[in-house]
Structure formats: C-alpha cells, structure tokens
Amino acid sequence: MKVILLTEVKKLGKKGDVVEVAEGYGRNYLIAKGLAVEATEGKLKELQQQKEAANRRKEKELQEARSLAEKLKNIELVLYGKGGENGKLFGAITSKDIAEALEKNYQIKIDKRKLDLKENIKALGVYTVEVKLHPEVTAKLKVAVKEEGRG
C-alpha cells in the first residue's frame, strides 16, 4: 500500500514522501499513530500542490534576497562613535547597531543575527560586513565608522 508520510519516520522517509509499505504496517502502525495517510488520488494532488506552493515561495524568497543584496551592495552605512586616542572607539559598534542604522536610514529591516560580524567594531575606519540573506545569497555591506562631531 502507498502512504504519504506526515512526519519523518526512521528508515522510511521524511515528511511529504510517498512510500510503499506492507498493508498491516501502513494501517496498523503508520496511519493509526498519525504518522501517515493513505495515498489516495486526491491526497497526492494536494501534496503536489503544496510542493509547488512551497517551491514558488522559496523562489520568491530567493529573488527578494537577491534584490536586497543588490541594494546593500550600493550602500555605505555611516555610523558615529565617540573616538579616543589612535582611532579607537569608546565602546563598540555591534551588529545590533548596524541593523538599527540600516532600518533607520534606509528602511531595510535585517535581523542582527544575519550580520556576520566576526567581532564588534572597536576602531574608526571602513569595514565590510557580510550579510547572510538566504542560504544561497550573501551580500557585502560597507560600514564606515567615524568619530562623532567630525563627520
């Protein structure tokens, strides 16, 4: 009998897979425990539509990420900090500061966890920060840190 798995089942498959199983195993275990449903024509059609919708959604997310990467490529974000001697900052610029400045200045909302800042910025200068927008899309954002009052 053919069943559609509703959750991952060890040694059988993952959610959404259509698998052939013994009649008793399918009815008495998989379907009874809610791990699968019988693969009727209607259920197979529904599964296909769900997969197509998921693919469209993933493609849309990828396109949006690529578009955002293009925008970020052309931005030089300027942040100001209180400077000390030798170009050092009092305090540091964090990924949270960068995310907030992007939203405030460019209306681009990015989760601070997507900013790949190896360590907080503690000196004046220009830095390149990687932004992980999507598993397949990474953008580079220029961040210039200048001393307050000097511009």
UniProtKB/Swiss-Prot annotation:
- Give GO cellular component annotations, separated by semicolons: ribonucleoprotein complex; ribosome
What keywords are assigned to this protein? Ribonucleoprotein, Ribosomal protein, RNA-binding, rRNA-binding
On whether RNA-binding is a keyword of this UniProt record, the answer is yes
Q: Which domain of life is it from?
A: Bacteria
Gene Ontology molecular functions: rRNA binding; structural constituent of ribosome
Q: Enumerate the InterPro entries for this protein.
A: Ribosomal_bL9 (IPR000244), Ribosomal_bL9/RNase_H1_N (IPR009027), Ribosomal_bL9_bac/chp (IPR020594), Ribosomal_bL9_C (IPR020069), Ribosomal_bL9_C_sf (IPR036791), Ribosomal_bL9_N (IPR020070), Ribosomal_bL9_N_sf (IPR036935)
One GO BP: translation
Tell me the disulfide pairings in this chain: none
Name a Pfam family for this protein: Ribosomal_L9_C
List, alphabetically, the NCBIfam families matched. Answer: L9
Family the entry assigns: Belongs to the bacterial ribosomal protein bL9 family.
Q: Could you tell me what this protein does?
A: Binds to the 23S rRNA.
Name by which UniProt lists this protein: Large ribosomal subunit protein bL9
Q: Which organism is it from?
A: Carboxydothermus hydrogenoformans (strain ATCC BAA-161 / DSM 6008 / Z-2901)
Organism phylogeny: Bacteria, Bacillati, Bacillota, Clostridia, Thermoanaerobacterales
